[in-house]
Swiss-Prot record:
Keyword ATP-binding set for record: no
Primary localisation category: membrane
NCBIfam families: ATP_synt_epsi, PRK00571.1-4
Origin organism lineage: Bacteria, Pseudomonadati, Pseudomonadota, Gammaproteobacteria, Alteromonadales
Subcellular location: Cell inner membrane
Record family assignment: Belongs to the ATPase epsilon chain family.
GO cellular component: plasma membrane; proton-transporting ATP synthase complex
Name recorded for this polypeptide: ATP synthase epsilon chain
Quaternary structure annotation from Swiss-Prot or TrEMBL: F-type ATPases have 2 components, CF(1) - the catalytic core - and CF(0) - the membrane proton channel. CF(1) has five subunits: alpha(3), beta(3), gamma(1), delta(1), epsilon(1). CF(0) has three main subunits: a, b and c.
Native species: Shewanella sp. (strain ANA-3)
The protein's role, per its UniProt record: Produces ATP from ADP in the presence of a proton gradient across the membrane.
A GO molecular function held by the record: proton-transporting ATP synthase activity, rotational mechanism
Pfam family, one: ATP-synt_DE
C-alpha cells in the first residue's frame, strides 16, 4: 500500500526552497501549532516566525526556519509562502544571538519614537531562529 502523502511547496520571495511529496508538515500558524497530513481540511492561515518540520515520503525529516508568511492547504497540495525561509543547517547561530541581543538592548533603551511592535517582531524572529538551532542540536545528540 502506498504511503499517504501530500504535495508540499515551500517558497520564499527569492526562490523555491522545497517541492516534493511529504507525509506531514508541522508549522506555527496564527492560532497555534498545526500538523498537516494527507486529507487535511482546506485551510488558510498566517504563519508566525518559527520552525517548519517536514517528514518526507521516506521517513526522513527536514527542518526550516520561517520568518512568517502564509499557509494554504488544499485537498491535494500544501503551499507555504514565506517572507524568509532558511534550512536549519544554514542558520548562523551567532548572528541570531546578536540580533536577539540588539533587539533586547533597543527595547531596554527605548525613546519616545520607539516602535515597540517592530522591536517585538525582530526579537521573535531571532528567538525563533535560536529555537530551530536548539531543535537541530537536540536531534543530533540523540
Amino acid at each position: 500500500m502506498a504511503a499517504m502523502t501530500v504535495q508540499l511547496d515551500i517558497v520564499s520571495a527569492e526562490s523555491s526552497i522545497f517541492s516534493g511529496r511529504v507525509a506531514s508538515l508541522q508549522v506555527t500558524g496564527s492560532e497555534g501549532e498545526l500538523g498537516i497530513m494527507h486529507g487535511h481540511a482546506p485551510l488558510l492561515s498566517y504563519i508566525k516566525p518559527g520552525m517548519a518540520r517536514i517528514v518526507k515520503q521516506d521517513g526522513s525529516e527536514e527542518v526550516f526556519y520561517l520568518s512568517g508568511g502564509l499557509l494554504e492547504v488544499q485537498p491535494s497540495s500544501v503551499s507555504v509562502l514565506a517572507d524568509v525561509v532558511m534550512r536549519a543547517k544554514d542558520i548562523d547561530e551567532q548572528a541570531a544571538l546578536e540580533a536577539k541581543r540588539r533587539a533586547e538592548a533597543h527595547m531596554a533603551t527605548a525613546g519616545a519614537d520607539f516602535n515597540y511592535d517592530a522591536a517585538m517582531v525582530e526579537l521573535a524572529k531571532a528567538m525563533a531562529q535560536l529555537r530551530v538551532v536548539e531543535t537541530i542540536k537536540k536531534n543530533i545528540a540523540r
